[in-house]
Amino acid sequence: MTEQMGQAMKERHTVRQFDGTPLTDEEKSTLQTRVDELNKTYDLAIALIESEKSPLSFLGKTLMSGKEVHSYFVLAGEDRTDIDEQLGYAGSDLCLYAQANGLNTWWMAGTFNRGYVKGLVQGKKIVSIIAVGHGKNQGVPHKSKTKEQVSSYEGEAPEWFNKGIEAALLAPTAINMQAFTIKGKGNKVTLTYKSGPMSGIDKGIIKHHFELGAGKENFEWA
């Protein structure tokens, strides 16, 4: 599955046009199994919801052209230290897993009706929702910074580090800022992200992508 996720990482782009076709029972079951695994592993409360009523804000409805999608991942968990980062990491996994299973996704951190969604997953901190469904297209690659703009390595960078940076640059970030810096020394890697309302989520997404590209067995987060 790691190889499939790596391929999905290269193919996955934000999709805002969906064809309105609902998820099949098999697709929902496949996604729910992944949600359950992530919740158990990281002690989260992510939910896959079906909603005829749109959970989008006015801005979200404006950005989504064509037919609306009615399936969403609600990224939720107990309000604790690093919960945003943990949900960003898990959300990234779900996006790539959906892509690997022929579906498309859209992160909607700032474009959903928070009051309505809170009623669906009560008593938890909700950091974002992710639309999931059948896209009319596969989206387009986002503009990207260069490897030199976001990373440095003490000495000659090993292949795993370079592959990790390439993967991190494929990660979706809030308004495509890519406001991260990754530094390496030996097998130790540090990640810093410019402070902002979405920085925790973005940091988790970047970590997930870097690990897929570099291989978790090759380094340690410092």
Model-found features: residue ranges?
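Acidic, surface-exposed loops and disordered segments
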Residues: 1-222
